[in-house]
Curated annotation (Swiss-Prot):
InterPro entries: MetalPrtase_cat_dom_sf_prd, YbeY
Source organism (scientific name): Chlamydia abortus (strain DSM 27085 / S26/3)
Protein name stated in the entry: Endoribonuclease YbeY
Role noted for this protein: Single strand-specific metallo-endoribonuclease involved in late-stage 70S ribosome quality control and in maturation of the 3' terminus of the 16S rRNA.
Gene name in the database record: ybeY
Top-level taxon: Bacteria
Any Pfam family: YbeY
Amino acid sequence: MKKVPLQVCVSNKQCDVPIRIQSVKKLVLCCLQCWKVSTDQVYVYFLDDEALAQLHDEVFADPSLTDTITLPIDSPESTAHPHILGEAFISPKAAIRFLQDRAEDTDLLYEEISRYVVHSLLHMLGYDDQTPEERKKMRGKENQALCMLREKHALLSD
C-alpha cells in the first residue's frame, strides 16, 4: 500500500492573534519528523476562549479557561489506517494572558503559542503533566523541541 503524506489539518476560529496556517503545518511536521513519529493525520484548532471553555466543559465537565486541550486518538503504536494521532485545541489568547501575567515581552507571543502546539503533540504521544515529575519531564521535552524549531526557523511567526 502506497504511503500517503502526513496531513496536518489546521483550523483558525479565533481573531485574537493572526495564525499562519503554513507555519503551523511546518512546526508540526518538523516535530514529528524529529521525533520519528509516523502518522497519517494531525488536527490543530485555534479557538477563542469561549469556545475552548465550552469544549473544556463538554469533555472534562470543567467550564474554566484553559490554554490547550488535547484529544489523542490513535496511540503512536496503533496500526489503525488511517492513523490519526489526535486533535489539539489551542487558545492564542491564553498565551497573551500568560505573558501579560508574568510581565513578559509580547515579542514572545508566537514562541508561547508554539509551545502550546508542542505541548499538545507531546500529549498525543503519551506524555502527561499531572505530577511535578511529569511536568518537569514534559517541560524539558518542550524546551528541546523549541530549540530545534528555532534552529530550523520553524517556530510560529506573524
